[in-house]
């Protein structure tokens, strides 16, 4: 049996036990923890209603800030999102570069792009992205009825078959971190590989943006009056996630190097635009243990075998640095965590499940960490959720010697 098949078999077993509580023994007693948090979208997300990081006033801008503003707000009117991120200039520049490609330079038509982004904003209950993107949707030809119908979802009357497929794909990526075969095949019946990759990454990246905006309490800009329709019931209905892929949907280019890099090399323009991980891995001032702790937890929550293996092993070296790998899979309720580690794991779970971080967890983090460190930890989780969704959906094959996802509760 090949390594990839072993990984897939173990992952399938893990999925079977993950939905239930599993026993953990400590000091002769048995407690029960959940292997996975509840899935995203179980309830309507509740974004923070006030800023947790104050937008940087113009009087505090340095030349570095002014350069970033000129790049991302050439009209001279930076919104609350940009002014909030200016508190960490390197983050602002890397975090906003990929959305700039997705909204202006990708292969998608403006209409399809608008459908994907607005549906993602609705799932996150994020008024900032919704209000910012509705004008672009109108320019793309969406009527007021179309915009409302995005909130009503893929089963609303009036969508073309392919538009409904796009909306179903958004819902599945949000809930399942994956797109099932039938809908993926429907996507590729109309899209080539570049369009398909752009569509998946548009959803994945706006999930990152919106969940961070929710957690940071970034408020809509006054010049964007549109809001998510409050009278549309919050409902996310998707099929059960299918077993992990055994063959790639996006075949990596031939050659040496990691399969993830060779997969994204199929779309050079997309690969060139993905600079945001450079901040996390090279510029961010976050100790390696904390970074790998949160990345492994989000990889586990998304059941991303590739992401898990890379950060347990050769890339992140989580096991080598002494992280309790199986306890990460068991989550914040597992015994042995320090208070700050437990708070970090809880924050990752909330960001995944609730699309925000609760006041209680934020306060707990704040007793141990400064706000920049908190933001850096959360952005690590949010960005690697984006990566995990892509890895799962594109079927990026494992590397030789990869360590599989652990089977919690049965070993």
Where in this protein do the model-derived segments appear?
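Hydrophobic alpha-helical segments
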Residues: 19-411
């Amino acid at each position: 049996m090949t390594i990839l098949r072993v990984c897939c078999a173990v992952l399938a077993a893990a999925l079977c036990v993950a939905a239930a509580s599993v026993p953990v023994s400590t000091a002769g007693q048995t407690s029960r923890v959940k292997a996975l948090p509840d899935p995203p979208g179980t309830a309507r997300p509740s974004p923070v209603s006030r800023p947790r990081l104050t937008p940087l006033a113009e009087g505090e801008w340095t030349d570095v800030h002014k350069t970033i503003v000129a790049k991302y707000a050439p009209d001279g009117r930076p919104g609350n999102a940009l002014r909030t991120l200016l508190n960490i200039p390197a983050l602002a520049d890397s975090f906003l570069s990929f959305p700039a490609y997705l909204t202006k330079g990708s292969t998608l038509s403006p209409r399809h792009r608008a459908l994907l982004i607005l549906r993602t904003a609705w799932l996150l209950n994020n008024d900032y992205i919704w209000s910012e993107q509705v004008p672009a949707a109108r320019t793309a030809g969406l009527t007021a009825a179309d915009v409302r119908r995005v909130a009503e979802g893929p089963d609303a009357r009036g969508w073309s078959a392919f538009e409904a497929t796009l909306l179903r794909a958004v819902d599945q990526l949000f809930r399942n971190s994956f797109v099932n075969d039938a809908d993926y095949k429907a996507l590729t019946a109309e899209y080539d590989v570049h369009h398909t990759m752009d569509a998946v990454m548009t959803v994945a990246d706006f999930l990152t943006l919106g969940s961070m905006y929710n957690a940071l309490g970034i408020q809509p800009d006054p010049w964007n009056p549109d809001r998510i329709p409050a009278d549309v019931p919050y409902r996310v209905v998707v099929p059960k996630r299918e077993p992990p892929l055994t063959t790639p949907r996006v075949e990596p280019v031939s050659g040496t190097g990691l399969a993830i890099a060779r997969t994204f090399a199929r779309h050079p323009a997309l690969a060139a635009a993905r600079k945001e991980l450079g901040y996390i891995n090279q510029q961010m001032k976050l100790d390696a243990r904390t970074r790998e702790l949160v990345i492994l937890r989000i990889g586990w929550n998304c059941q991303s075998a590739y992401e898990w293996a890379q950060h347990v092993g050769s890339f992140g070296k989580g096991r080598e640095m002494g992280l309790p790998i199986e306890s990460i899979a068991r989550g914040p309720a597992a015994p042995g965590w320090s208070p700050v580690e437990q708070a970090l794991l809880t924050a990752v779970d909330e960001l995944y499940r609730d699309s925000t971080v609760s006041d209680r967890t934020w306060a707990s983090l704040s007793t141990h960490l400064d706000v920049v460190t908190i933001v850096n930890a959360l952005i690590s989780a949010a960005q690697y959720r984006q990566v995990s969704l892509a890895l799962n959906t594109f079927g990026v094959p494992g590397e030789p010697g990869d360590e599989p996802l652990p089977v919690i509760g049965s070993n």
